[in-house]
UniProtKB/Swiss-Prot annotation:
May be involved in recombination. One of its GO terms (molecular function) is double-stranded DNA binding. InterPro entries: RdgC (IPR007476). It holds the Pfam family RdgC. Belongs to the RdgC family. GO terms for biological process: DNA recombination; regulation of DNA recombination. GO terms for cellular component: bacterial nucleoid; cytoplasm. Its main location: cytoplasm. The keyword Cytoplasm applies. The lineage of its organism: Bacteria, Pseudomonadati, Pseudomonadota, Gammaproteobacteria, Alteromonadales. This is Recombination-associated protein RdgC. It is found in: Cytoplasm, Nucleoid.
Length: 303
């Protein structure tokens, strides 16, 4: 349940959640496994997995949702080889070249034949809906997968007035200033990893890992015009992460000490422990987002 990445959206119109109403809306788009002829299926599943009973888990004004995707694994090379073999056979038998339309129809036929025998894989993606700060946090490093979940949520509830989180000042400008000055806002501590890019196509990209970012070797790249597009940071004593210039927060890692905050509950009641961990995690993520927004100079005015 502990989030590992954050793709952040903000509501550009006031948004509130009625848990019971949202639960009913999600039920119409519940996940069901692929049939023999389905290439993929995507739908909402229990927010707390096998220990939960509902599609939405709520604590205060914080709401967790989860979606499951099943995809058939049908390698394109397998289809290509089967198609080439069939095309060669028919062209030899009929002594003519097949048209593209005929080949496309054959490809569809081959795909339909192979689908029932294909293996499948499942993945899950979660999101935290936070009306109290008017944001949605998606646990994914992929913008495309995050958008897919938001599209499903929008389809379920009819409207979802969100836009990606963006800031008044370009993030790379702020990150470059922090690295240049060797100082971050009080809530954060700079770690030992950064990626710098030049604005020009010829300038290239340079990456530093496990290196003191205050060294002249690093700062020299800033002097010649490169800007920081990725910077490893630590939030208080709780979260390590990589902040990117596109506002994505990746490689989110909660410290062992922080995750142990509910150890006194034990594991006799898994749902009680999950509920407590959800409250702990969501509170700290809200604190992280609020601190990040403040440190980066505030959100861009919504349009």
């Amino acid at each position: 349940m502990w989030f590992k990445n954050l793709t952040v959206y903000r509501f550009n119109k006031p948004f509130s959640v009625d848990p019971d109403s949202l639960e009913k809306s999600l039920e119409d788009f519940t996940f069901s496994p692929c049939s023999s002829q389905d290439i993929s299926k995507f739908g909402f599943s229990k927010a707390m997995g096998k220990h939960g009973e509902t599609l939405i888990h709520t604590a205060g004004d914080r709401h967790l949702i989860c979606a499951t995707k099943e995809e058939k694994i049908l390698p394109s090379q397998v289809i290509k080889e089967a198609l080439e073999e069939k095309v060669s056979q028919i062209e030899a038998e009929e002594n003519r070249k097949l048209a593209k339309k005929e080949k496309d129809a054959m490809k569809d036929e081959i795909t339909t034949t192979l689908l029932p025998r294909a293996f499948s894989r499942r993945s899950q993606i979660r999101a935290l809906i936070l009306p109290e700060i008017q944001m949605v946090l998606v646990d994914s490093s992929s913008a495309a997968k995050s958008e897919e979940l938001m599209a499903l949520l929008r389809k379920a509830i009819g409207t979802l007035p969100i836009i990606p989180m963006s800031f008044k000042t370009p993030i790379e400008t702020q990150l470059t200033e922090w690295l240049k000055e060797g100082k971050t806002p009080a809530a954060f501590e700079m770690q030992d990893e950064a990626e710098l890019k030049s604005d020009s196509d010829e300038g290239g990209i340079v990456r530093f890992k496990q290196q003191d970012l205050s060294e002249n070797e690093v700062l020299a790249h800033i002097e010649v015009g490169k800007q920081v597009h990725k910077l490893a940071l630590h939030f208080g004593q709780s979260i390590a992460f990589l902040l990117q210039s596109d506002a994505a927060i990746k490689r989110l890692k909660f410290s062992e000490e922080f995750r142990a905050g509910n150890d006194d509950l034990g594991n006799d009641d898994p749902m009680a422990r999950l509920d407590a961990d959800f409250a702990l995690m969501s509170s700290e993520l809200i604190a992280l987002i609020n601190a990040t927004v403040e440190a980066l100079g505030g959100l861009e005015d919504s349009i």
